[in-house]
């Protein structure tokens, strides 16, 4: 009989592991798909995550209400898994079927009634996410109802199933972040998970009707002998206070995850793998903590004492680690380069290992305590063993609902008002508050003071010492390894904002440097200025007359100033996702002068892709200079679907200029980026500034009259701006064109078949983080044999003198392709 029961228990345990795995993969996929549907700004992300967590909370609560009355909880579990699969299969069909409806809502409400717009996004999230997440949240109480057959093993079973499901989620995080989506893409990953859920559901349903379960169902009746003395020891208080404590623990936990994510993203550079690593470490701690505590709870008469100690030590460890967060980028940088040298230059593996190590140092101890808290809370709460499903459901529901509130507080209150390190102290105080709620109850336990004496004072001392340390630390610190190592920059602006952390500093050479979440994104050094100024003027000079121009991204405002100073521009629309970036320029006029107050400028705070997709406006020129594709989320600004959106927003003679890096990217990934761009636009050319590719795409061929082009160039504001980056004549400007359409086609056809970067495969986002050490020389050397262009490809009229000057300028640029890469960059 033991073997039969063990076999049934093992099978359901494996199924529950798979439930956790699929749930996390779904969460990652759904958040990606919803970001494509209604934008990836912080409000969209928060709405999506909040709805997901709220569904889990509601599902657990409902399951708790009805679970104890179910005769076959495993049957219901199996049915729920199949419903989850069906919901996941329908998810993309539902959201992308609402495209036109959402476009109407956007156009009517985004600008004039933003609250209604956000409410509609919330309704979409509820409509698409709530049902499957309710089903997910309902599963744990059902398994506790089935398998917690003796009161003494309640804590053990809760801890076991909570840990096995969390371990599944951990596996799903690593699988989705490193393997599955990268290999199979979003669509096939969804199909694989749907099939997995269906198989899990069918197996659970089959076993719910067989002899194994019947024997298990009789087992509780034979074994459940109550020890009245034990129950009196365990429950000498009102258990509803456990729910309040659990709520605040969940609130603190998710706020902690939000703050840790910001800290580690700034330390690691926010690649898609960085987020997966952080989440994996978080989940591993919860898994390990719940697994380790489960055995100890079996014979413990006072689980509330364990819960009380856990909350105290959570407060202490979070506070203790807060001052150490400043060292995270330095530890990560040194560790990465040390491991790289030990691994014969394998930066990719070294970086991943270093991120895991640093994340574990900050996260693992507190999350282990968090993982142990849930089983302890469940056992502390349940008065009547006959209502074990209800107790489990209620505790899980309160904890998860607290997590919903915590995610909002962490992102919208703590970070923008207090910054990262002070936020950690406040979160530690929340854990202390959770412990104080419990202290009122445990005082009824005989000799409780002598039991917790050590645990009462030491955590408080640690908390106070850490708080003092944080209070005397500088509030403006640069979370960038190279900055910390090589210089002590003057901080012009620092903001831990709602959407991102913005740092603008002045270097030792008086260059202004802008960082977003720890990544250096722009500076006023000569090389960077050259590409930013060209991004502004080049498409306008090629177009001739641009009544409506759009610029994606503000950065340091160099391109923006060039566009505003260009007399060819009549109306300019800036689309910037980060309100903190706008604030930085408004508070520091030295960065971009008075550009943001220019009468020609209209500012839109939105995800650029979402705005272009939803707006009806068309443009003569669109300039796109996104971050490097290795930064998470930015890869969507390099996909075929995005280029098609931009193409649809061009007027008949419209031009798009897209920046594509030639540094920290492999030749293969560069080829993917170029091939993707050329798949969409019928006409294109490649312009080059050291390490930076400027790709010009248009609906119609560009046919310039050189005299008209030169006349536009010689307008004083344009000529002055271009002289500042060393371009003295219109011929020299044309010399920056490296390849025309014919030469680009020859280059792309010279090697193996090149894949297209799409929303589904996200090739660049998943591959470029591993290519940090790739050099520009490797790409330039492969491009070199195909460099060249015919003047007739963009010029319809020119003199022999002009032809010779253009060719001389081109030859000069080509001859410098390799030598300039050896010149020092500030």
Locate the predicted segments by residue.
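Alpha-helical transmembrane segments of multi-pass membrane proteins
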Residues: 1-711, 768-775, 789-796
């Amino acid at each position: 009989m033991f073997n039969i029961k063990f076999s049934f228990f093992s099978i359901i345990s494996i199924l529950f592991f798979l439930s956790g795995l699929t749930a996390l993969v779904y969460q990652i996929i759904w958040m990606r798909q919803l970001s494509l549907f209604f934008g990836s700004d912080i409000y969209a992300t928060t709405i999506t995550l909040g709805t997901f967590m709220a569904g889990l909370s509601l599902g657990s609560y409902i399951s708790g209400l009805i679970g104890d009355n179910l005769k076959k909880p495993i049957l219901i579990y199996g049915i729920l898994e199949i419903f989850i699969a069906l919901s996941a299969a329908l998810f993309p069909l539902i959201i992308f079927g609402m495209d036109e409806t959402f476009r109407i809502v956007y156009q009517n409400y985004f600008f004039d009634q933003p609250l209604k717009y956000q409410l509609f996004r919330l309704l979409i999230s509820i409509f698409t996410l709530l049902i499957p997440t309710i089903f997910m949240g309902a599963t744990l109480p059902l398994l506790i109802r089935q398998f917690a057959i003796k009161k003494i093993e309640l804590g053990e079973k809760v801890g076991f199933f909570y840990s096995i499901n969390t371990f599944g989620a951990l596996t799903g995080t690593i699988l989705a972040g490193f393997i599955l989506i990268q290999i199979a893409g979003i669509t096939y990953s969804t199909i694989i998970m749907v099939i997995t859920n269906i198989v899990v559901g069918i197996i659970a349903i089959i076993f719910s009707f067989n002899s194994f379960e019947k024997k298990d169902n009789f087992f509780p009746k034979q074994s459940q002998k109550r020890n009245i003395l034990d129950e009196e020891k365990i429950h000498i208080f009102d258990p509803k206070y456990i729910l309040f404590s659990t709520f605040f623990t969940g609130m603190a936990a998710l706020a902690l995850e939000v703050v840790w994510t910001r800290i580690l993203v700034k330390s690691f550079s926010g690649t898609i793998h960085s987020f997966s690593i952080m989440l994996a470490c978080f989940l591993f701690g919860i898994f390990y903590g719940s697994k380790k505590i489960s055995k100890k709870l079996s014979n413990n008469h006072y689980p509330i004492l364990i819960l009380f100690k856990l909350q105290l030590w959570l407060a202490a460890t979070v506070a203790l680690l807060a001052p150490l967060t400043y060292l995270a980028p330095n530890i990560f940088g040194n560790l990465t380069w040390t491991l790289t040298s030990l691994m014969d230059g394998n930066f990719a593996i070294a970086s991943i290992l270093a991120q895991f190590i640093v994340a574990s140092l900050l996260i693992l101890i507190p999350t282990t305590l968090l993982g142990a808290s849930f089983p302890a809370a469940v056992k502390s709460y349940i008065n009547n063993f006959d209502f074990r499903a209800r107790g489990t459901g209620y505790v899980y529901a309160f904890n998860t609902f607290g997590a919903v509130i915590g995610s909002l507080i962490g992102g919208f209150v703590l970070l923008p008002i207090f910054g990262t390190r002070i936020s950690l102290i406040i979160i530690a105080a929340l854990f202390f508050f959770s412990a104080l709620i419990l202290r009122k109850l445990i005082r009824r336990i005989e000799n409780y003071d002598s039991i917790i004496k050590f645990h009462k004072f030491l955590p408080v001392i640690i908390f106070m010492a850490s708080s003092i340390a944080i209070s005397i630390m500088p509030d403006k610190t640069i979370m960038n390894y190279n900055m910390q190592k090589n210089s002590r920059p003057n901080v012009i602006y620092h903001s831990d904002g709602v959407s991102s952390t913005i740092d603008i500093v002045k270097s030792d050479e008086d260059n202004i440097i802008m960082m977003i979440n720890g990544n250096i994104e722009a500076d006023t050094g000569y090389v960077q200025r050259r590409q930013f100024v060209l991004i502004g003027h080049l498409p306008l000079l090629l177009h001739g007359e641009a009544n409506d121009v759009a610029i994606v991204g503000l950065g340091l405002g160099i391109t923006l100033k060039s566009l505003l100073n260009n007399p060819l521009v009549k109306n300019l629309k800036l689309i910037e996702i980060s309100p903190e970036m706008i604030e930085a320029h408004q508070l520091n006029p030295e960065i971009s002068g008075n550009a943001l107050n220019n009468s020609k400028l209209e500012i839109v705070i939105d995800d650029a892709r979402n705005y272009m997709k939803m707006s009806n406006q068309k443009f003569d020129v669109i300039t796109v200079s996104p971050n490097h594709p290795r930064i998470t989320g930015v890869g969507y600004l390099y996909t075929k679907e995005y280029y098609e959106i931009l193409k649809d927003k061009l007027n008949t003679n419209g031009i798009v200029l897209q920046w594509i890096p030639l540094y920290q990217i492999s030749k293969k990934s560069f080829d993917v980026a170029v091939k993707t761009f050329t798949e969409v636009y019928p006409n294109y050319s490649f312009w080059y500034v050291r390490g930076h590719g400027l790709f010009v795409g248009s609906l119609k061929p560009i046919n310039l009259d050189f005299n008209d082009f030169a006349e536009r160039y010689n307008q004083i504001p344009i000529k002055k701006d271009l002289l500042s980056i060393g371009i003295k004549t219109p011929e020299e400007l044309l010399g920056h064109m490296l390849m025309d359409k014919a030469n680009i086609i020859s280059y792309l056809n010279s090697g193996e078949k090149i894949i297209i970067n799409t929303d589904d495969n996200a090739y660049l986002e998943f591959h470029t983080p591993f290519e940090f050490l790739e050099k520009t020389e490797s790409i330039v050397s492969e491009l070199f044999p195909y460099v060249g262009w015919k003047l007739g490809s963009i010029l319809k009229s020119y003199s022999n003198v002009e032809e010779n000057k253009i060719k001389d300028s081109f030859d000069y640029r080509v001859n410098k392709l390799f030598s300039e890469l050896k010149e020092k960059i500030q």
